Swiss-Prot record:
This is Uridine-5'-phosphate dioxygenase. Its cofactor is Fe(2+). The lineage of its organism: Bacteria, Bacillati, Actinomycetota, Actinomycetes, Pseudonocardiales. Pathway: Antibiotic biosynthesis. Fe cation binds at residues 105, 107, 247.
Amino acid sequence: MQQLQADFRDPRCVSPVDFADHDAPSQIVGNVEEHGFALVDMADAGPPDARIAALSTALRLGEPYIPALYRYGETKDYSAPYSDIRSEPTDRHPGFSTTAGQIWHVDGLLDDIGEIKTTILYCVRAAHRGGDTMLFNSLAAFAELREKDQDAAEALLSPAALNRRSTIPGIDVNATGPVFSVDDNGDLVTRYTDNETCTWDYSAGPPGGLRRALDFLRTATDDPRYRLAVRLAPGQALVFRNDRLSHGRQPYEDKPDARRHLVRALYAEAPRASN
């Protein structure tokens, strides 16, 4: 897997692909395979949903995926295929509607590890200050850990290691599973999350392994080889492998008449170029 050798200090990581190029889909797929993500300039103006749909069609992603958490009656307001992410004081969603930062997570709190393979974020309007999307190459960090401390890495593979619970008011649901796993193709996948949704079972795996593993990963999130801040400009999209990267958000400030506005779509397929 190329992403295991990625170095986020390389400025080519954030070199955007022009979606108008005839070979843009191949460029995007190549960047995603190499780095886990691709930045895309969507030059043509139009409704955000239409721009994301054009991008997802070019990448053969299929229809947007609705996460399991949003299939409950109490969460139906968040079940749209395209989710608006902007500050809204009357909204109770702990991530979409606040200007606060978001700590490392993967999308799909209740979904099986590797189920949601792709996230697209499209920028309608950038924040006045802050609001960068943070990316963490958790797979590469895990590969380094596995070389240095096999017992710690084994603890992260335990099916009891990580429980994630909903923090949406009134929705008492949770899911337990490994932090890393190997999919049917033999590739590493992740659900590394380290935020207020998490409960860790330190008895999982070899004694002391999970604590050492978390110490290692938390240190790795500050390593510039693995950590990157991406500030999207209006009309840009970020395509990333939700099953191979963890992500977060810097806190931000809005102007009263110009709120930061991103639109998100999730997919169960990985990007593929046309034959």
